[in-house]
Amino acid sequence: MQLRKPATAILALALSAGLAQADDAAPAAGSTLDKIAKNGVIVVGHRESSVPFSYYDNQQKVVGYSQDYSNAIVEAVKKKLNKPDLQVKLIPITSQNRIPLLQNGTFDFECGSTTNNVERQKQAAFSDTIFVVGTRLLTKKGGDIKDFANLKDKAVVVTSGTTSEVLLNKLNEEQKMNMRIISAKDHGDSFRTLESGRAVAFMMDDALLAGERAKAKKPDNWEIVGKPQSQEAYGCMLRKDDPQFKKLMDDTIAQVQTSGEAEKWFDKWFKNPIPPKNLNMNFELSDEMKALFKEPNDKALN
């Protein structure tokens, strides 16, 4: 997929949302907040096609469940720095480049569909969890694929640079399944590989699979199957060793979740018609998500 907008040309006004009171201390030298204050701009990473978390709608506006969190964090930064007119730049990122671009300072944080796990914590820091998912399979309805055991000797697609790619390769090696694993650039490319018949199944986080199904020409032709191979926690990603910025992000997320606002966002993006095709994902709030909204935390689940 080609980037539809240059990274430096996308400007967005962050939407207002319920905000937590941030730490009143001045930004620490060298911190993300200090960088933002000095430059007069906050640079936010986003995904292009992670429906319904972070993606372009029909007007090329970045929208989604995770983007609502991102907007709330931007508003909290404006309040913290007393800069209501702070410039906001949005840049598109992928599963492959999100960590390097964060580390080299290209963007300040991102809320998308990034799993917080122990391995990634060596490279980046994560906010409180914003979503909990399970990794499953999207396949043609009524076909032969009902669970992961049916993938033996079959072609399976997965998005490159994701934890699902790691899991699928591990499963293939440990179970001697002789799968032909296709690594696609992004979730949209993964689904097109499935849709074209080049793969019999697409392995990914269940909520993202529901998003790809909702975008399909004929959503009813596809079903999500299989016992979850892992449970994963999505968090907003920021640079390591920046406790002040992490606290601002965590406080904002906790306020949104405990106030009931996050559940409204969930209903908006997972239980109602959404762009670009006004299709309903019909994805119910899980017990894990209900528990998260009651007690926000930043625990990695794997």
From Swiss-Prot:
Pfam families hit by this protein:
SBP_bac_3
Q: Does the keyword Transport apply?
A: yes
Compartments where located: Periplasm
State where it is primarily located: periplasm
Q: What are the recorded Gene Ontology BP terms?
A: amino acid transport; L-aspartate import across plasma membrane; L-aspartate transmembrane transport; L-glutamate import across plasma membrane; L-glutamate transmembrane transport
Q: Which InterPro entries is this protein grouped with?
A: Bact_solute-bind_prot3, Solute-binding_3/MltF_N
Write down the CDD domains for this protein, in alphabetical order.
PBP2_GltI_DEBP
| Zinc-finger as UniProt keyword | no
- Annotated signal peptide: 1-22
MF (Gene Ontology): aspartate binding; glutamate binding
- Give the protein's biological function: Part of the ABC transporter complex GltIJKL involved in glutamate and aspartate uptake. Binds to both glutamate and aspartate.
Protein family membership = Belongs to the bacterial solute-binding protein 3 family.
What is this protein's record name? Answer: Glutamate/aspartate import solute-binding protein
Q: Which organism is it from?
A: Escherichia coli (strain K12)
Organism lineage reads as:
Bacteria, Pseudomonadati, Pseudomonadota, Gammaproteobacteria, Enterobacterales
